[in-house]
Amino acid sequence: MKDKRIYGMFGHKIKDMRLEHGLRQRHLAELLETDMPMYSKMELGARRVRRDMIPKLAELYKVNEHELMTLWLADAVFAALKSEEKSLQLDAVDLAKEHFKADKGL
């Protein structure tokens, strides 16, 4: 059976924050304007949190939005490369890092 948890880093983070604040999934689903089953899948890493939800989460939990966005993007990179062989994953990440460093905004 294929593992459907591809957005796990961000999902774990939002679950940990929710539990630390003693909130229920229902409350978060309402805040993010989604239903509870979808929110549950986000925490499990089976569904991706939408980008527009990140500022709401940062405000609710009083955390740095940039840090949440970084984690969210890292999950996207991981999801894109997850099915590739390990050496190819690492080479692709290294090449992308080089490209970002060399990019002059053109």
Predicted regions and their residues:
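Flexible coil/turn residues that form the inter-helical turn or adjacent wing/linker of helix-turn-helix
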Residues: 10, 21, 35, 50
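Residues within the helices of the helix-turn-helix
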Residues: 15, 26, 55
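Residues in the recognition helix of alpha-helical DNA-binding motifs
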Residues: 17, 31, 42, 71
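Short alpha-helical DNA-recognition segment
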Residues: 22-41, 60
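DNA major-groove recognition helix of helix-turn-helix/homeodomain DNA-binding modules
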Residues: 33, 50-67
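Short, charged recognition helix plus adjacent turn
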Residues: 69-106
